[in-house]
């Protein structure tokens, strides 16, 4: 059994801590590793893990030792493997502790997920640092070579069983205060602020098929309130506009959010963690990518669309691509959604195929464990 330090700096939203918490749990549960997760904002961690104590300096959850990443840093012995998630800067004293071990620590920089081809030439390459240690860059991805995707053992089978049971879905939705009506399409919305949202909500309002839009607490809630012309929205609120019913859900733990995705006919997601989980749901998805300076995020979006659409029928691929690009550009959804809405059943089959294909590849945690074994 190896020891692991995973450092997470919560820069924005919950994607960084979401990814690192899933990874830490999987390393401990499935690979028997001793994991310490260092978090600089324990309050953010407590949002995705309600069992967590937001003021505790040290706590053990799901076999993971979760520690507050305090400043100034209180030196501790370094682990066999040290992961800096998403280029967060390790404490200088910890880098020194890594170097002074009898066998220096394996230093990994866990990069952001990307479908871009260039990551294949950079994945797992070392970079000699000023302190004398080599840092290896580990890129999660959808093609080889890459670090793969986070996926717990048995995840897809659990999802299939859940989606095959209407009673299991209804019971879960009822625990959130949701009652699905016959013939109602379920859509989840977890996004950044988006000027394209009102146009889409208008189309859902005017559609022939009724929709229930489930909106967990988050940044997009203010945009939804503006469209509804209400001052505020709170958990449990329900508003009806013609064919569209909108219900506000609480911010939920990761496993519950997975089940919400499994219940829905379409999932609008954001960032990285929910993006990957929506793919494992095997359902149509709409990705709101995190905006970066100089529009560099658009290259990542295009790269994923190229890969995701490669096996789709031409008309579905065209409508999907147009809709995604408009959603991320902030408007112009009308024509794309009209075509895409008719293709949702076909898109669902393709989404299941995509999840199955990606599910055949080794997962991120397994690849990290193997990389360490090969490095020794």
UniProtKB/Swiss-Prot annotation:
Top-level EC class: transferase
Active-site residues per Swiss-Prot or TrEMBL entry: 16 (proton acceptor), 272
Statement: the UniProt record of this protein carries the keyword Transferase: yes
InterPro entries reported for this sequence: EarP (IPR016633)
Annotated consequence of substituting residue 112 to F: Decreased but not abolished protein-arginine rhamnosyltransferase activity
Sites where the protein binds dTDP: 14-15, 192, 252-254, 270-274
Binding annotation for dTDP-beta-L-rhamnose: 13-16, 192, 252-254, 270-274
Keywords recorded for this protein, A-Z: Glycosyltransferase, Transferase
GO molecular function ontology, one term from the record: protein-arginine rhamnosyltransferase activity
Superkingdom of origin organism: Bacteria
Catalytic activity, reaction form: dTDP-beta-L-rhamnose + L-arginyl-[protein] = N(omega)-(alpha-L-rhamnosyl)-L-arginyl-[protein] + dTDP + H(+)
EC number(s) given by UniProt: 2.4.1.-
Effect of a null allele: Reduced bacterial fitness and reduced pathogenicity.
Swiss-Prot/TrEMBL domain comment: Adopts a GT-B fold and acts as an inverting enzyme that converts the beta-configuration in the dTDP-beta-L-rhamnose donor to the alpha configuration in the N-linked (Rha) arginine product.
Family: Belongs to the glycosyltransferase 104 family.
Its biological purpose: Protein-arginine rhamnosyltransferase that catalyzes the transfer of a single rhamnose to elongation factor P (EF-P) on 'Lys-32', a modification required for EF-P-dependent rescue of polyproline stalled ribosomes.
Protein's name in the database: Protein-arginine rhamnosyltransferase
Source organism: Pseudomonas aeruginosa (strain ATCC 15692 / DSM 22644 / CIP 104116 / JCM 14847 / LMG 12228 / 1C / PRS 101 / PAO1)
Source organism phylogeny: Bacteria, Pseudomonadati, Pseudomonadota, Gammaproteobacteria, Pseudomonadales
Gene that encodes it: earP
């Amino acid at each position: 059994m190896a020891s692991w330090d995973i450092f997470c700096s919560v820069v924005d939203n919950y994607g960084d801590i979401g990814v690192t918490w899933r990874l830490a749990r999987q390393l401990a549960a499935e690979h028997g590793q001793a994991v310490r997760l260092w978090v600089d904002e324990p309050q953010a961690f407590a949002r995705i893990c309600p069992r967590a104590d937001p003021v505790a300096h040290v706590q053990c959850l799901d076999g993971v030792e979760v520690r507050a990443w305090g400043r100034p840093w209180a030196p501790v012995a370094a682990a066999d493997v040290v992961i800096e998630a998403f280029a967060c800067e390790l404490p200088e004293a910890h880098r020194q502790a890594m170097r002074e071990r009898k066998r220096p620590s394996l230093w990994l920089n866990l990069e952001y997920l990307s479908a871009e081809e260039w990551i294949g030439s950079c994945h797992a390459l070392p970079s000699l640092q000023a302190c004398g240690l080599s840092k290896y860059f580990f890129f999660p991805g959808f093609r080889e070579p890459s670090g793969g995707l986070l996926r717990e053992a048995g995840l897809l089978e659990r999802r299939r069983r859940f989606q095959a049971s209407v009673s299991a879905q209804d019971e879960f939705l009822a625990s959130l205060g949701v009652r699905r009506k016959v013939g109602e399409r379920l859509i989840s919305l977890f996004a950044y602020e988006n000027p394209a949202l009102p146009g889409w909500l208008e189309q859902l309002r005017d559609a022939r098929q009724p929709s229930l839009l489930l909106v967990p607490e988050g940044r997009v809630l203010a945009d939804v309130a503006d469209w509804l012309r209400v001052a505020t929205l709170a958990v449990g609120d329900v508003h009806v506009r013609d064919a569209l019913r909108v219900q506000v859900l609480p911010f939920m733990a990761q496993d519950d959010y997975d089940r919400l995705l499994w219940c829905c006919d379409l999932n609008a997601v954001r960032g990285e963690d929910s993006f990957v989980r929506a793919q494992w749901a095997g359902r149509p998805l709409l990705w709101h990518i995190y905006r970066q300076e100089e529009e560099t995020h658009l290259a990542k979006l295009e790269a994923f669309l190229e890969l995701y659409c490669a096996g789709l029928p031409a008309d579905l691929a065209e409508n999907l691509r147009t809709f995604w690009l408009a959603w991320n550009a902030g408007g112009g959804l009308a024509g794309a959604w009209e075509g895409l809405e008719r293709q949702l059943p076909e898109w669902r089959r393709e989404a299941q195929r995509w999840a199955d294909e990606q599910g055949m590849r080794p997962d991120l945690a397994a690849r990290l464990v193997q990389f360490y074994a090969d490095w020794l």
